[in-house]
């Protein structure tokens, strides 16, 4: 039987607003970004038609707020099947109308889940800089992989090559996929780039996923980094480097009393507080020195060029104190779930602080309205096994670290138990002609979604066929003698244990 590990779904509180999504986002979001985003969509036979339709609808909603085009965001869609299929590349659509129509026309490929071949195509033809139809130079590149988690293959190596080449990798899994594998392939931080969600609830991660993409491709023109008590590093995207002339005029000073950060108003004009520096056209950074500790500064950067008028950019930052306060101890900083079965899960948390914590309290209930259960754990333990759970059920779990003073720190997750997967009980194979066999089996289990048939067609070749749950027989052609033929039941989250015969 294929063993599937349980997935931990981060509990999200989402506020949904009615109305036109395009009208509900501000201009700062619409024009926030520049970058190339490729979506790798699992379109194989392991994905039910309903699930595929939900994934495409999710992409439509996810991408609707973005401005598209050569000066904004470009989007590509690569489908995973027996052979990868580039539905459309980065140059295909520069308007939401065209993109949305293309998504509506997208059809499922079915066939095998050949994710590795699709990744090789993505790296060689789509995400590579400088090739026709490829990514743009000097801009962020993002790969978002949407998968049901069934048989992804050995994706770690091709994903690692993409990350080494500067591609940010994000993953959305709608099934009980291998958490360890998916955690390895995403770009850090994992908590912002790896999403587990049931297909019926996929819309709840839309805002978080969009924000994660925006964080990577945001066209931040003016950024302040490496801030100390007396200095800061100013960085910007060079807009004069191609002109060969001009310079950057930089002004900075303490913010005026009553001035709101981020609102134009210029630096303070108090005597001795105003500073000005310039940098040549090919510059993209400047060091700001002579700053006062624990002070909020406003800085403006104006590109000067006789050939064109360019916008003045402004930002603000606060220098560090001379003796910054010691960071507070996190009583509870991480929470994870592992070793899931159909009726139990292991819950682990960190850090373990027996000198500060009196006890840990676990509260959990089945969603949406199951009875609340409470489990208390000693302050010397950082994990426990919760038993007597219902199979294929989502639970809302809260772990609280309680101090003797009465203060506490709590974290909440969604826990998903495994589905019970009955095995196939009978399989009969009979020959009905030259290289033609007929299969019959017994099925009709609760929760059955269909049957997965595989057979050998020659040396190192294998064919697959997905059948609906009401089919209990099929005829296969081109099955050589002594070929191995297998049938497995398919459930919502995984395949059950199948049976095999030899032709």
UniProtKB/Swiss-Prot annotation:
Main localization, broad class: secreted
Subcellular localization: Secreted, Extracellular space, Extracellular matrix, Basement membrane
Complexes and interactors: Homodimer or homomultimer; disulfide-linked.
Function: Promotes matrix assembly. Involved in the organization of skeletal muscles and in the formation of neuromuscular junctions.
Residue ranges occupied by any Fibronectin type-III domain in the UniProt entry: 218-324, 331-423
Entries under InterPro entries matching the protein: ECM_Assembly_Org (IPR050525), FN3_dom (IPR003961), FN3_sf (IPR036116), Ig-like_fold (IPR013783), VWF_A (IPR002035), vWFA_dom_sf (IPR036465)
Keyword Magnesium: no
Domain VWFA: residue ranges: 36-213
Residues of the signal peptide: 1-21
Keyword terms of this UniProt record: Basement membrane, Disulfide bond, Extracellular matrix, Phosphoprotein, Repeat, Secreted, Signal
Keyword Signal part of the UniProt annotation: yes
The species this protein was found in: Danio rerio
Entry-linked SUPFAM superfamilies: Fibronectin type III, vWA-like
Name of the gene this protein is made from: vwa1
Gene Ontology CC entries for this record: basement membrane; collagen-containing extracellular matrix; extracellular region
Annotated GO biological process: axonogenesis; neural crest cell development; regulation of cartilage condensation; regulation of cartilage development; synaptic assembly at neuromuscular junction
Lineage top rank: taxon: Eukaryota
Name of the featured protein: von Willebrand factor A domain-containing protein 1
Gene ablation phenotype (knockout): Mutants primary motor neurons have reduced axonal branching innervating the muscle fibers and secondary motor neurons have aberrant axonal structure. Mutants skeletal muscle show also an abnormal structure with disorganized myofibers and reduced synaptic formation at the neuromuscular junction. They show a progressive impairment of locomotor behavior and have smaller jaws and abnormal cartilage patterning compared to controls.
């Amino acid at each position: 039987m294929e063993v599937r590990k349980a997935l931990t779904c981060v509990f999200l509180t989402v506020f949904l607003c009615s109305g036109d999504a395009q009208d509900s986002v501000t201009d700062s979001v619409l024009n926030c970004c520049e970058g190339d985003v490729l979506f790798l969509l699992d379109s194989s036979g392991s994905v039910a038609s309903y699930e595929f339709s939900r994934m495409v609808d999710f992409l439509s909603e996810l991408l609707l707020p973005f401005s598209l085009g050569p000066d904004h965001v470009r989007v590509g869609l690569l489908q995973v099947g027996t052979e990868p299929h580039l539905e459309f590349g980065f140059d295909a659509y520069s308007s939401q109308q065209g993109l949305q129509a293309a998504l509506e026309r997208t059809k499922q490929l079915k066939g095998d889940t050949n994710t590795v071949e699709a990744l090789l195509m993505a790296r060689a033809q789509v995400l590579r800089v400088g090739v026709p139809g490829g990514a743009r130079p000097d801009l962020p590149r993002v790969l978002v992989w949407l998968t049901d988690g069934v048989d992804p293959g050995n994706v770690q190596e091709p994903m690692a090559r993409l990350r080494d080449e500067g591609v940010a990798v994000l993953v959305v899994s709608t099934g009980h996929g291998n958490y360890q594998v998916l955690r390895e392939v995403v770009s850090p931080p994992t908590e912002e780039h790896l999403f587990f969600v049931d297909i019926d609830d996929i819309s709840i991660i839309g805002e978080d996923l969009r924000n994660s993409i925006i964080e990577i491709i945001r066209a931040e023109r003016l950024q302040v980094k490496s801030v100390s008590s007396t200095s800061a590093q100013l960085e910007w995207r060079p807009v004069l480097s191609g002109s060969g002339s001009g310079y950057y005029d930089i002004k900075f000073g303490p913010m005026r009393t009553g001035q709101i950060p981020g609102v134009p108003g210029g630096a303070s004009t108090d005597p001795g507080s105003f500073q000005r520096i310039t940098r040549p056209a090919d510059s993209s950074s400047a060091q700001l020195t002579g700053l006062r500790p624990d002070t909020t500064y406003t800085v403006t950067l104006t590109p000067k060029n006789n050939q064109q008028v360019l916008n003045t950019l402004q930002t603000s930052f606060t220098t560090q104190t001379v003796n910054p306060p010691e960071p507070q101890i996190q009583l509870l900083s991480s929470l994870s779930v592992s070793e899931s079965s159909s009726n139990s899960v292991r819950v682990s948390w960190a850090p373990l602080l027996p000198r500060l914590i009196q006890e840990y309290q676990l509260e959990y209930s089945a969603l949406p309205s199951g009875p609340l259960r409470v489990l208390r754990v000693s302050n010397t333990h950082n994990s426990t096994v919760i038993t007597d759970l219902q199979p294929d059920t989502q639970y809302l779990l809260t772990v609280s670290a309680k101090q003797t003073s009465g203060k506490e720190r709590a974290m909440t997750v969604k826990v998903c138990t495994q589905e019970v997967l009955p095995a196939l009980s009978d399989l009969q194979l009979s020959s009905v002609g030259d290289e033609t066999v007929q299969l019959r089996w017994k099925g009709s289990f609760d929760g059955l979604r269909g049957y997965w048939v595989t057979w050998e067609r020659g040396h190192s070749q294998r064919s697959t066929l997905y059948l609906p749950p009401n089919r209990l027989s099929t005829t296969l052609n081109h099955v050589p003698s002594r070929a191995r033929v297998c049938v497995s039941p398919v459930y919502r989250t995984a395949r059950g244990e199948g049976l095999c015969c030899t032709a």
